[in-house]
């Protein structure tokens, strides 16, 4: 596996700004599904080490096993071979130390925004009083700018607001790993950029480890510390890992004026559309 470290026009964050402890470890992971035509290997011998507090984006064409990889980190699926560990413990099932935000929001439509967050807090922190749990839910809705909408149900708010509720719900239980499965893929460009900015601010405050799937190279370059680029499936693997050098806190306008941004962007585009072109992608 090769690592791209391009010329750095902007300084990286200083060591005091970042945690450097290996925290999430994906070791020799393969995933094979039985089919009528025989075993189908989605992922083969995947290795990745993520530092505590690091923000990782994963990109690749449909069928490269991105969601399968996240499902194994989430505990929704198990590797056929290899192991996935968080904090030195092998993942065997879902747990409150790992929370997932999906593209489709996954909110309960008969509950208000506050109740959707409260129910997660109640499940994990049942020992707390009702007042304490409601305060946690309200604080996290306020964090994503939904104080005035917490009594509305999902059908009464926009897609961007629904995703804010999903993010608030995930973070309200203080997970060690936040797993994002294309959380902004269904949103319009303006709302998408707004939520990207909010996500970075929240991540900066919480400093949990983030593993995020995206199909958007620009999104990855703005958000991530490193970009994991997957080869095509079957037998998909990590093709390269790109280190993203822009300092934090990040300024979108400043980044997009930097020549390094376009070098990294063009390299990722070449990886996806030339070296690992996919017929299903326009």
Swiss-Prot record:
GO terms for cellular component: plasma membrane. Residues 24-257 form the ABC transporter domain. Signal peptide: none annotated. Induction: By carbon dioxide-limited conditions, probably via CmpR. PANTHER family: NITRATE ABC TRANSPORTER ATP-BINDING PROTEIN, TAURINE IMPORT ATP-BINDING PROTEIN-RELATED. The gene is cmpD. This is Bicarbonate transport ATP-binding protein CmpD. It is found in: Cell inner membrane. Keywords: ATP-binding, Cell inner membrane, Cell membrane, Ion transport, Membrane, Nucleotide-binding, Translocase, Transport. The complex is composed of two ATP-binding proteins (CmpC and CmpD), a transmembrane protein (CmpB) and a solute-binding protein (CmpA). GO terms for biological process: monoatomic ion transport. ATP binds at residues 60-67. Pfam families: ABC_tran.
């Amino acid at each position: 596996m090769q690592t791209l470290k391009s010329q750095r026009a902007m300084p990286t964050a200083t060591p005091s700004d970042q945690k450097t402890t290996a925290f999430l470890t994906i070791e020799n992971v393969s995933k094979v599904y039985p089919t009528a035509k025989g075993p189908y290997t989605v992922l083969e011998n995947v290795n990745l080490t993520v530092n505590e507090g690091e923000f990782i984006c994963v990109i690749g064409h449909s069928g490269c096993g991105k969601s399968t990889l996240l499902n194994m980190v989430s505990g929704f699926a198990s590797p056929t071979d290899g192991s996935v560990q968080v904090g030195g413990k092998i993942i065997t099932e879902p747990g409150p130390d790992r929370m997932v935000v999906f593209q489709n929001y996954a909110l309960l439509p008969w509950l208000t925004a506050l109740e959707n967050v409260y129910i997660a807090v109640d499940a994990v922190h049942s020992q707390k009083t009702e007042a304490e749990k409601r305060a946690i839910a309200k604080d996290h809705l306020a964090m994503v700018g939904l104080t005035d909408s917490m009594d509305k149900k999902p059908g009464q708010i926009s897609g961007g607001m629904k995703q804010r509720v999903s993010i608030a719900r995930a973070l309200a239980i203080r997970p060690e790993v936040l797993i994002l499965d294309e959380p902004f893929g269904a949103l319009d460009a303006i709302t998408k950029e707004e939520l990207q900015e909010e996500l970075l601010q929240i991540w900066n405050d919480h400093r949990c480890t983030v593993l995020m799937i995206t199909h958007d190279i620009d999104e990855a370059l703005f958000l991530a510390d490193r970009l994991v680029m997957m080869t095509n499936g079957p037998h998909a693997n990590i093709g390269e890992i790109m280190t993203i050098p822009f300092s934090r806190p990040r300024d979108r306008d400043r980044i997009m004026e930097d020549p390094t941004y376009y070098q990294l962007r063009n390299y990722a585009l070449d990886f996806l559309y030339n070296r690992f072109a996919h017929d299903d992608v326009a």
